[in-house]
From Swiss-Prot:
CDD domains: MFS_MefA_like. Residues 1-17, 74-90, 166, 248-256, 302-304, 365-366 are periplasmic. It is found in: Cell inner membrane. Catalyzes the facilitated diffusion of 2-acyl-glycero-3-phosphoethanolamine (2-acyl-GPE) into the cell. The chain crosses the membrane at residues 18-38, 53-73, 91-111, 145-165, 167-187, 227-247, 257-277, 281-301, 305-325, 344-364, 367-387. This is Lysophospholipid transporter LplT. The keyword DNA-binding does not apply. It comes from Shigella dysenteriae serotype 1 (strain Sd197). The lineage of its organism: Bacteria, Pseudomonadati, Pseudomonadota, Gammaproteobacteria, Enterobacterales. It is a multi-pass membrane protein. It holds the Pfam family MFS_1. GO terms for molecular function: lysophospholipid:sodium symporter activity. HAMAP family: MFS_LplT (MF_01585).
Length: 397
């Protein structure tokens, strides 16, 4: 089946619906599994600084497999790549259920996620293009954030009831994603027949990195999305320690409710970006990025639940408005230069390197005993300064 058959079809075509459902279930499993596994670490008396280490082994898999997953996504039908990747996630979640070391099981989920990401975003450029691509990204982000909203809450609430039930629910979600992937049309491979020599693949990936980094637009997108997702993941772990200190609440569910507020906000922000920002007006998203850091700083000083909910929702709105146009810009420019799969793989390397760095710094700060509120204040201020610097650089170039 040729790729052109599906390009420029309705945003609600059968293929797009299958992609969105598969993404929802896969992301639901990812987010529920994080909080279920954090509850498992707490129940097994792991130290607090080990919590971000869990996410670090996950993103480490992204970085390790970054040179290869883009070519995998471009060499096979992307729907089948997504199905295989969700199968790996299912295996990882099931292994934690059956008592395998949670860090090992979560690493396997990370390998599946690394393979999944270039395919899930790359397939959008095959199902639609041009002006519809920003809207397709909005649908993908809305689906993802809805899954974050429900998955995070489900993981925390079920873990308060029984950790094993929470872990089993994650495995079921991944199983559902595998089934949904079956209904994605089998599009032609974007770049079949490439060499599978690991040295050549690594060299090709480094060439893709160089190509995207040397282009001003794609470099701008790579830096912006890397900063955003690195900060977003760090904020999730910050909330786990901030809630008992600032609010005096010690259950597993409250941090997930707060994360849900961010998720709701991102859905709103992603929708606004799809309507108000085009590939030609991407710079409109930059003030929102700066305000994210400012609002995080203000949030860190709160001691009441209602203001915390409101500020986190605002952070989400700003985040959705900021990141969706940057994603669309990279996909459109990257598809023309290095292929959509390679472009997303390079993006994953940048984003996960930022996550690894920020989580490492955060884990170190917790380990040496810095209080969580000053960590939050410094985190927000540094993020605002970083996005300001990126905007100044973008305007000059």
């Amino acid at each position: 089946m040729s790729e052109s058959v599906h390009t420029n079809t309705s945003l609600w075509s059968k293929g797009m619906k299958a992609v969105i459902v598969a993404q929802f279930l896969s992301a639901f499993g990812d987010n529920a599994l994080l909080f279920a596994t954090l509850a498992l670490l707490k129940a097994q008396f792991y130290p607090e600084w080990s919590q971000p280490i869990l996410q670090m082994v996950f993103v480490g898999a992204y970085i390790l497999f970054a040179p290869f997953v883009g070519q995998v996504a471009d060499s096979f039908a992307k729907g089948r790549v997504m199905m295989f990747a969700n199968g790996l996630k299912l295996l990882g979640a099931a292994s934690i259920c059956f008592g395998i070391n949670p860090f090992l099981g979560y690493t396997l989920v990370g390998v599946g996620a690394a393979a999944y990401s270039p395919a899930k975003y790359g397939i959008l450029g095959e199902l639609t293009t041009g002006s519809k691509l920003v809207k397709a990204n909005g649908l993908m982000e809305a689906s993802t954030i809805a899954a974050i909203l429900l998955g995070s809450v489900a993981g925390g609430v079920l873990a308060d009831w029984h950790v094993l039930v929470a872990l089993a629910a994650c495995a079921l979600a991944y199983g559902g994603a595998v089934v949904a992937n079956i209904y994605i049309p089998k599009l032609a491979a974007a770049r079949p027949g490439q060499s599978w020599n690991l040295i050549n693949m690594t060299r090709s990936f480094l060439n893709a990195c160089t190509s995207l980094w040397c282009n001003g637009e794609t470099r701008f997108s790579l830096v912006g999305t890397s900063l955003f997702w690195g900060a977003g993941v760090t904020l999730r772990f910050l909330l786990v320690l901030w809630v008992p200190v600032a609010l005096g609440i010690t259950d597993n569910a409250t941090p997930t409710y707060l994360n849900a507020m961010v998720a709701i906000g991102i859905v709103v922000g992603a929708g606004a970006a799809a309507k108000l920002v085009t590939l030609e007006t991407v710079s409109r998203c930059m003030p929102a990025g700066i305000l994210i850091g400012v609002v995080v700083l203000i949030f860190s000083l709160q001691h009441e639940l209602l203001p915390a909910y409101a500020l986190l929702m605002l952070i989400g709105v700003l985040g959705g408005f900021f990141v969706v146009p940057l994603n669309a810009l990279l996909q459109e420019r990257g598809k023309k230069s290095v292929g959509a799969g390679n472009a997303i793989a390079v993006q994953n390397l940048g984003e996960n390197s930022a996550m690894l760095l920020m989580l490492g710094i955060y884990s170190l700060a917790v380990m040496v005993g810095i209080p969580v509120v000053p960590i939050g204040i410094g985190f927000g201020a540094l993020f605002a300064l970083a996005i300001t610097a990126l905007w100044i650089w973008q305007r000059r170039h």
